[in-house]
Amino acid sequence: MIFVDTNVFMYAVGRDHPLRMPAREFLEHSLEHQDRLVTSAEAMQELLNAYVPVGRNSTLDSALTLVRALTEIWPVEAADVAHARTLHHRHPGLGARDLLHLACCQRRGVTRIKTFDHTLASAFRS
């Protein structure tokens, strides 16, 4: 089970960027190998937060379509928020959203994470 962070979807559907192809290749490889990809409703909210204020509705729609097509989407539960709070002392460099991603992963037994955020990836491995 692989948790897919918001930035993977953003790079996959976004403007030209050095991480665009690695994001797309990861998603294609996962699809070919029938990897179980998961994410959370919080990741979808992050897409809204990134694209709505700048009027990039078409990109938002593409990203949301990709999320729904390729991943199992978890709700964020009160227990996830409570666990995120307990993780803050171990990972003070993570923001609230990444703490929530980490909490969702830990509570559901995620074995791998795909993110281009080195801080989140490091916290996941620790």
Curated annotation (Swiss-Prot):
Domain of life of the organism encoding this protein: Bacteria
Membrane-crossing ranges are none
Q: What is this protein called?
A: Ribonuclease VapC23
Native organism is Mycobacterium tuberculosis (strain CDC 1551 / Oshkosh)
Q: Which EC class is this protein assigned?
A: hydrolase
Q: Does the keyword Magnesium apply?
A: yes
List, alphabetically, the SUPFAM superfamilies matched.
PIN domain-like (SSF88723)
Report the Pfam families cross-referenced here. Answer: PIN
* Keywords for the protein's UniProt record, in alphabetical order: Hydrolase, Magnesium, Metal-binding, Nuclease, Toxin-antitoxin system
Q: Tell me which residues make up the PINc domain.
A: 2-118
Query: To which protein family does this belong?
Result: Belongs to the PINc/VapC protein family.
| Acetylation is among the record's keywords | no
What are the required cofactors? Mg(2+)
The role this protein plays is:
Toxic component of a type II toxin-antitoxin (TA) system. An RNase. The cognate antitoxin is VapB23.
GO terms (molecular function) for this protein are: magnesium ion binding; RNA nuclease activity
Q: What is its EC number?
A: 3.1.-.-
Per UniProt, where does Mg(2+) bind? D5, D98
